[in-house]
């Protein structure tokens, strides 16, 4: 009886298996789509997506700016209308010349305060 030394396996073991079944092949992770696209293609697609997102963001910002400008025009128009109505009410109570003087004074104050 000779010493029973285990015969070296035909394939080189990369690492020792945790469960001790070293005669089985090491399993690799199941990745069906793993190597189908190259890194350069993925990088190009990512770059293209980023460009599209940037363009969409610019469009959204432009649309929002137009919307804000429209809102601002409406507010200015309403303020002018209210001011005109206020002066008309004042004109009913006072003389025309005095209303014009008050208008000038308010415009001066508005310019100084702004």
From Swiss-Prot:
Keywords: Coiled coil, Nucleus, Ribosome biogenesis, rRNA processing. Residues 1-47, 77-114 are annotated as: Disordered. One of its GO terms (biological process) is rRNA processing. Belongs to the CGR1 family. The gene is cgrA. GO terms for cellular component: nucleolus. Residues 40-101 form a coiled coil. Residues 77-93 have a biased composition (Basic and acidic residues). It is found in: Nucleus, Nucleolus. It holds the Pfam family Cgr1. This is rRNA-processing protein cgrA. Residues 94-114 have a biased composition (Basic residues). Involved in nucleolar integrity and required for processing of the pre-rRNA for the 60S ribosome subunit. Residues 1-13 have a biased composition (Low complexity). The keyword Ribonucleoprotein does not apply.
């Amino acid at each position: 009886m000779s010493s029973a030394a285990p015969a070296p396996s035909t394939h080189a073991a990369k690492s020792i298996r945790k469960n001790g079944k070293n005669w089985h092949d090491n399993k690799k992770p199941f990745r069906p789509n793993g190597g189908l696209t190259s890194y350069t293609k993925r990088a190009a697609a990512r770059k293209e997506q980023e460009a599209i997102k940037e363009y969409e963001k610019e469009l959204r910002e432009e649309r929002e700016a137009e919307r804000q400008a429209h809102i601002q025009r409406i507010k200015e128009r309403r303020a002018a209308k209210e001011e005109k109505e206020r002066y008309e009410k004042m004109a009913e109570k006072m003389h025309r010349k005095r209303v014009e003087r008050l208008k000038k004074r308010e415009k001066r104050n508005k310019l100084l305060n702004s």
